[in-house]
């Protein structure tokens, strides 16, 4: 509902959003949390098409830098449907649409007896390119939603990222939002577990 305006959604492509490599591209956190893989294609030296598969998390080498070779393009984006896995994403911006993110977060996980497992969490706006939040994933992995505390998340975020203000948001604001989005996602899971225990949905 918040991904671009109707004109952008009518003309833009997912491959273009990925290949652009913007630090605040909105599709990439979602695809990283879903462990997406790209198929890259180009015309080879002998006139035959050559393809290769690259995990999205290995696609970026720096700000607006990718592993794409001359003449190569993104042919396909593949990921598994969440199924029993939980998935949430949220974009923070000043306007509802036609605005660039201050940050966007996406998280996927599985419920293992009330514990969050196989956690994948990704952000844009915190690093030179959209990336998985590995240390935060480790801090969340195996815990129940009510076991996550603000101090731990704040400490991990402070240790994991360069504290740099941007044109659209200060570092302090982005760090606060990054933590609160994790809490929002896991609180949704806690509510779902409580509803499942009472037979309500």
Features from the language model and the residues they span:
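C-terminal structural segment of proteins
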Residues: 1-201
């Amino acid at each position: 509902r918040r991904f671009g305006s109707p004109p952008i959604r009518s003309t833009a492509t997912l491959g273009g959003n990925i290949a652009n490599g913007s630090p605040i591209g909105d599709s990439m956190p979602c695809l990283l949390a879903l462990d997406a893989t790209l198929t890259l294609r180009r015309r080879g030296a002998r006139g035959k098409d050559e393809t290769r598969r690259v995990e999205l998390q290995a696609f970026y080498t720096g700000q607006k830098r990718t592993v794409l070779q001359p003449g190569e393009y993104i042919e396909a984006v593949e990921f598994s449907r969440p199924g029993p896995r939980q998935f949430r994403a949220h974009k923070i911006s000043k306007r509802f649409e036609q605005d660039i993110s201050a940050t966007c977060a996406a998280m996927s996980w599985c419920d293992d007896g009330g514990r969050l497992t196989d956690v994948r969490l990704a952000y844009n706006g915190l690093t030179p390119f959209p990336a998985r939040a590995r240390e935060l994933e480790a801090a969340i992995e195996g815990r129940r939603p009510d076991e996550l505390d603000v101090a731990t998340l704040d400490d991990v975020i402070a240790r994991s990222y360069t504290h740099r203000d941007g044109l659209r948001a200060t570092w302090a604001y982005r760090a606060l939002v990054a933590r609160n989005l994790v809490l929002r996602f896991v609180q949704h899971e806690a509510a779902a577990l409580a509803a499942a225990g009472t037979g309500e949905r």
